[in-house]
Amino acid sequence: MSDHKLVTEWFRYANNDLIVAKHCFNDLYPKQTEIAGYHCQQCAEKALKAFLIFNSMEPPKIHDLRVLCKMCKDINPSFLEIANQCSRLTAYGVATRYPDELVPDINMITLAIIEAQQVYDFCLEKIK
């Protein structure tokens, strides 16, 4: 697969995660906040990794958005603008997958969806 096609696929998968997050939060009752949070983290992770691939870097097999954002910042210092979003979204990658770890409330997921969209849009803009 060409690098361009691979980057496109990473962004497609990231967008799908965002769609799932919004569906779990907006369309299901009761709201599936833990699943929505997980997919917000996944959206941001895949968008950051797409940016790294676009810049000919092999993304590490990690889920810590803070590390991925720092790697992106080393390429483009403007990634500092989304560092706080990445830091907050990191918690949803593991803790929401297990009972009694993190049960996000409605306000937390409302913010997580907004921030996942911000990270996605930011990364996409940086490859144009």
Regions inferred by a protein language model and the residue ranges of each:
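Terminal alpha-helical segments
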Residues: M1-K128
